[in-house]
Amino acid sequence: AGGRFSLTTLKWNDLSLGAVSGRVRQQARGADFAATHQSALLPGARLAVDGHVALATGETIPRVSLAYRLERAASREDIDLGALKADWAGIRGNGRITAAGRGVYEPGSLQADLRMEISGGRLTIPQKKAGILGFEGAVVFPDLTTLRSAPRQQIAFERTYVGDLAASDGRIEPGGVFFLEQGRFQWCQGTVYLPATRVMPGKDEYDLTLSCDRLKLAPLLEQIGAARAEGGGTVSGRVPIRIRKGQFQVDSGFLYSSPGEGGTIRLRGTDMLTAGIPPGTPQFNQLELARQALKEYDYDWVKLTLATEPREDLLRLKLQLSGRPTHPLPFI
């Protein structure tokens, strides 16, 4: 003997989970069953369950064995994960998901496992301009009752970003280790590349070398607080960074213009060059001449060196230019 059943809406903790339908067939000492669930929380997800319930002679508690499989194809539109958990509101996700496992319940014990795979995954937080794209991998839970995954598992991703900072080709390793094969972000209308980096929980000391490619000189000088600047020209080079307990230090970085590529730079707000120096002195006159020259200067090449003074917690900048003032200088 057998029969069918269906539930239009299945609820749990005031959440409408979706519809359930299935069939039951009685056996000599139990019953076989099969059911499907169309998720309302995760649109497009379908869960199929097949199982058997048996009651042994002299026992009052049945034994249950079942196999389950979940499938969801990537959808055209991302979904708001706030439907799954209120704290996730504003996080949007997508991707193809498959999961399968088996479970056995016997009097006094419960065993269940799960293997879940995802491909083409994406999670974005539009309000914060952050996301992780193209992630894929498999996670195995040998024992679902403890929700602990098996060791040595990895999830790879194509790209992750926060604002203008982006990294590509990375993976999440066991123990919460975050590995980036390549990182990059746009700065001063150029590109800064980060080396392969492994970020580990509890570690607060890192040494990185940033490779800078064609940063615009004028906005660069402004952003590091050297002076207000206008004009063309780019610089490239390397900037070693030391991170110690959340503090950043620059260790002898240098940036230089490409050979044969000069430009014109106009600096404003250079009064600091002569600040505190008595007017009329030779030192004042030399610096005032340089200040006037930098108001508009045609350079053949430019070089910047940067270094942090640990004791003073200051970034020291040295600017070297080879060229000539665009206009004749006043007599000083």
Feature names for model-found ranges:
Residues 1-100, 108-109, 119-228, 263-332:
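Interface amphipathic segments
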Residues 234-236:
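Short, solvent-exposed loop/turn segments enriched in Ser/Thr/Gly
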Residues 247-249:
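A short beta-turn/strand-edge loop motif at beta-sheet boundaries
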Residues 257-263:
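Short edge-strand/loop segments of extracellular domains
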